[in-house]
């Protein structure tokens, strides 16, 4: 029994730190809506940690003296850091769900066949779709730039200048550079 007590204490201590880490991670999603876009875009789930920090920065940035520009710049930096973690696979963001079991090449081939079939038709809408398709980025870094541009152009109304200090207490670790 003498040996069991220290082991139980150690397990309890590790369990508490794990619970604190989980709780702290969960608190960072309190003011976040993820990478909300009207469309399902590539990298949306992969960029979610950066989006959570960005959303918290927009909600609580003024309380901690972080400007909207600083939030947006940190957002781009965080997304580029995520892209660099992909290493040589930085051409595309990892897929989620069922597509994870397929290779990146197989998924790309399947996508290109679907696009080719859809765009081979000669309608006006398909001509427009072809134009848009060729403007879309093909790399993780390209998508990061697009997400960054989107918040720069359309995020002004979301940056909060009237946030209550009480709602942001304990969220310092959810902000850029903290």
Swiss-Prot record:
Expressed by the venom duct. It is found in: Secreted. The modification 4-hydroxyproline is found at residues 38, 42, 49, 137. The modification Pyrrolidone carboxylic acid is found at residue 131. Residues 1-24 form the signal peptide. SUPFAM superfamilies: Phospholipase A2, PLA2. Its EC number is 3.1.1.4. Residues 98-130 form a propeptide. The active site is at 54. One of its GO terms (biological process) is arachidonate secretion. Keywords: Calcium, Disulfide bond, Hydrolase, Hydroxylation, Pyrrolidone carboxylic acid, Secreted, Signal, Toxin. Its main location: secreted. Its cofactor is Ca(2+). It catalyses: a 1,2-diacyl-sn-glycero-3-phosphocholine + H2O = a 1-acyl-sn-glycero-3-phosphocholine + a fatty acid + H(+). GO terms for cellular component: extracellular region. GO terms for molecular function: phospholipase A2 activity; toxin activity. It is an enzyme of class 3 (hydrolase). Catalyzes the calcium-dependent hydrolysis of the 2-acyl groups in 3-sn-phosphoglycerides. Heterodimer of an alpha and a beta chain; probably disulfide-linked. Belongs to the phospholipase A2 family. Group IX subfamily. This is Conodipine-P2. It comes from Conus purpurascens (Purple cone). The lineage of its organism: Eukaryota, Metazoa, Spiralia, Lophotrochozoa, Mollusca.
């Amino acid at each position: 029994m003498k040996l069991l007590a220290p082991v139980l204490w150690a397990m309890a201590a590790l369990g508490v730190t794990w619970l604190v880490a989980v709780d702290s991670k969960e608190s960072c999603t309190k003011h976040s809506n993820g990478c909300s876009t009207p469309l399902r875009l590539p990298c949306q789930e992969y960029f979610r940690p950066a989006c959570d920090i960005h959303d918290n920065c927009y909600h609580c940035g003024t309380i901690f003296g972080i400007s909207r520009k600083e939030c947006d710049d940190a957002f781009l930096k965080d997304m580029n850091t995520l892209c660099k973690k992909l290493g040589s696979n930085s051409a595309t963001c990892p897929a989620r769900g069922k597509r994870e079991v397929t290779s990146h090449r197989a998924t790309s081939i399947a996508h290109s066949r679907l696009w080719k079939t859809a765009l081979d038709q000669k309608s006006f809408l398909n001509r427009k779709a072809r134009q848009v398709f060729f403007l879309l980025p093909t790399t993780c870094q390209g998508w990061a730039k697009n997400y960054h541009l989107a918040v720069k152009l359309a995020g002004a109304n979301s940056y909060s200048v009237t946030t209550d200090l009480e709602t942001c207490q304990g969220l310092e670790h959810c902000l850029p550079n903290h």
